[in-house]
């Protein structure tokens, strides 16, 4: 059974005990036993509290949920841009064809050297081997029902890539609807999205198709992509189980405009370099999964998923005029399964209790090739690697409520890594590092002593291991490496002092025992040891809805990073900041229903500068503040039109990195200038 619920911002939790007195006097809002914050409308499948696996919002302490209604009309070219609305999320806009950008949080950057966020699509693991998130591009806004963002180290359900947290993108399941969205705008951007839902007594069907093309803000930046998916789920008359199949396919081809010198970027931001004329990328991805949820008894529920992911990526790129063009090819096949068993017995001496155990595995078959090229013609091969990378994990977690206002969630997870590596250029085979059994204890507590506030705290351990060749014992390295252990904790307060206000304030910290960083431009595929690191920061969020016509939001994140004990290869990085981590991230906005048919909105987002490398000697770049406007007019019950103006002030902003090999200077990728997009949404 599908139930559409409108959830006002259920803010996030706890804070130092100093703040306790601020909320003790106000009993206006309903008590909240979770620390999750929800924005927008989310589809609830059945009785998510009383049955099935433990929900993300009820178990974990740092959760943000974005509803589909605030996502479906956002003017974005890639889904990672949707996370502008999520608090504390850093967006890294490469703007290089198929390598368009990515998300990160908790003081980790989006460079691709340390990929600290696990991506799931409808609960299916969707990172590539290196931890990047190309599968996110498969999802378009109109297909989404919600996005869950879990920040921190307390989630025991996932192991690999779950260093700083995870993101789960849920698409529409069930419902009777026909939706279409057409969009046209600056840089000859053209987009079509079609979504269809069919719900019968036992079967639900969901279909989606999207096509987008654009010339891009910069020269030599054309992109063309399409995505399609189907979901088929069956539930018998007695509702004892639900069985489903999900299939997705995505293809794209895009030109790369390349990186510019600082002078060219500021004076001619839309230009490209002559040597980038043949740079481009192609990408093809597939995802197939089977889902089963069943009630074995009144107190026992079982959930299982099995899946197959394929990733086919080819890219030609040249970073500087004196550097060679490279062809980078990646072919990955992933298959795996996840399962959980949830027991909800009646324990007379507890207010509530649930126990959940789960296990998962993923097996990867990967090929990584690189060539030195000229105008995409191969001159020499520089990499030919084939490697298996397999992970096996299990966890146990309990939800214990001694009384109504206190929830305690202890958890424990273990992971094991296996695999093998072959260098096809030499014919030599290598074993994977024996990381041992990676043990990860966790504990979360939520205390709600008043109806207007919840205090929360959590502590947890996650891990990082090498990716690509760095996961294997390849000479001169012949001894096993230990995983980098990440210990993190957080405390905060979630508050609702009135019916029209809610928010969250939190402090967090995370330390890594031996962080490793991928060498992105090295044909060997190896990594560098960054060393012992610490990250910490504050998060704040406030949501206001003073009347039925007005919504306002404000989020702010302060984050800091430091290298405590560097590796011997870069001793001058001791005490320095990790690169590409801005200290401040913020976004704010207002939505106003001017008339029953007309909605007006304005929003801004920004960040401060960051260092380009770990010794912090090459200056700081990347800060910006962008202003945006929007208007939506409902012509009829089934037709609405909208107009979106991005970067209202035509502000220059950029992504920058330091090239130590070719330019030996900062290279720049300018962001889009002022842009206008118009859209028509049909809802039948």
Predicted regions mapped to residue ranges:
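Gram-negative outer-membrane beta-barrel transporters
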Residues: 343, 404-408, 416, 507-511, ...
């Amino acid at each position: 059974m599908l139930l559409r619920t409108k959830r006002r911002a259920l803010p996030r939790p706890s804070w130092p005990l100093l703040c306790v007195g601020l909320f003790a006097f106000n009993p206006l809002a309903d008590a909240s036993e979770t620390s999750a914050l929800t924005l927008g409308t989310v589809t609830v499948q059945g009785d998510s509290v009383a049955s099935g696996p433990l929900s993300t919002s009820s178990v974990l302490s740092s959760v943000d949920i974005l509803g589909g209604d605030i996502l479906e009309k956002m003017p974005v070219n890639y889904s990672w841009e949707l996370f502008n609305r999520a608090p504390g999320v850093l967006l890294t806009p490469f703007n290089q064809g198929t390598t368009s950008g990515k998300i990160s949080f908790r003081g980790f950057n989006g460079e691709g050297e340390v990929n600290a966020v696990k991506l799931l699509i409808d609960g299916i693991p969707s990172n590539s081997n290196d931890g990047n998130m190309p599968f996110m591009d498969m999802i378009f806004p109109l297909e989404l029902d919600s996005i869950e963002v879990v920040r921190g180290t307390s989630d025991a359900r996932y192991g690999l890539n779950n260093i700083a947290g995870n993101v789960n993108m849920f698409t529409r399941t069930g419902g009777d609807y026909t939706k279409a969205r057409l969009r046209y705008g600056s840089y000859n951007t053209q987009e079509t999205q079609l979504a269809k839902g069919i719900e019968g007594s036992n079967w639900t069907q969901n279909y989606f198709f999207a096509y987008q093309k654009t010339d891009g803000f910069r020269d030599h930046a054309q992109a063309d992509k399409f995505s399609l998916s189907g979901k088929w789920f069956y539930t018998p008359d007695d509702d004892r189980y639900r069985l489903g199949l999900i299939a997705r396919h995505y293809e794209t081809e895009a030109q790369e405009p390349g990186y510019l010198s600082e002078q060219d970027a500021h004076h001619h931001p839309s230009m490209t370099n002559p040597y980038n004329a043949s740079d481009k990328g192609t990408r093809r991805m597939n995802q197939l999964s089977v889902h089963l949820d069943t009630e074995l008894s009144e107190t026992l529920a079982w959930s299982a998923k099995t899946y197959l992911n394929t990733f086919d990526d080819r890219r030609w790129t040249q970073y500087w005029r004196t550097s060679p063009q490279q062809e980078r090819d990646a072919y990955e096949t992933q298959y795996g399964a996840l399962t959980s068993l949830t027991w909800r017995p009646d324990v007379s001496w507890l207010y509530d209790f649930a126990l959940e155990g789960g296990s998962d595995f993923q097996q990867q078959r990967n090929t990584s090739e690189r060539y030195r090229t000229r105008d995409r013609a191969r001159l020499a091969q520089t990499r030919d690697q084939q490697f298996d990378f397999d992970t096996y994990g299990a966890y146990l977690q309990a939800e214990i409520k001694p009384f109504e206002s206190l929830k305690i969630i202890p958890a424990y997870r273990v992971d094991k890594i296996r695999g093998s590596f072959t260098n096809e250029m030499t014919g030599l085979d290598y074993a994977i590092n024996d990381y041992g059994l990676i043990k990860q204890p966790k504990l979360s507590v939520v205390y709600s002593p008043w109806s207007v506030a919840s205090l929360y705290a959590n502590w947890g351990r996650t891990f990082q291991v090498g990716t690509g060749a760095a996961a294997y014992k390849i000479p001169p390295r012949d001894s096993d490496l230990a995983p980098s252990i990440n210990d993190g904790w957080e405390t905060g307060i979630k508050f609702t002092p009135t019916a029209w206000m809610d928010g969250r304030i939190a402090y967090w910290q995370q330390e890594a025992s031996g962080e490793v960083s991928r060498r992105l431009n090295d044909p060997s595929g190896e990594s560098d040891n960054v060393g012992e690191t610490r990250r910490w920061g504050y998060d704040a969020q406030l949501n206001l809805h003073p009347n039925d016509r007005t919504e306002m939001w404000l989020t702010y994140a302060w984050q800091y990073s430091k290298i405590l004990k560097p590796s011997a290869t870069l001793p001058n990085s001791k005490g320095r900041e990790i690169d590409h981590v801005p200290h401040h991230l913020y976004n704010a906005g207002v939505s106003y229903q001017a008339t029953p048919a007309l909605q007006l909105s304005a929003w801004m987002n920004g960040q401060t500068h960051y260092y380009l490398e770990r010794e912090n000697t090459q200056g700081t770049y990347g800060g910006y503040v962008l202003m945006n406007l929007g208007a939506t007019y409902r012509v009829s019950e089934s037709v609405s039109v909208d107009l979106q103006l991005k970067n209202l002030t035509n502000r220059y902003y950029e992504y920058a990195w330091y090239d130590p090999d070719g330019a030996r200077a900062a290279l720049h990728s300018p962001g889009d200038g002022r842009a206008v997009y118009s859209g028509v949404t049909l809802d039948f």
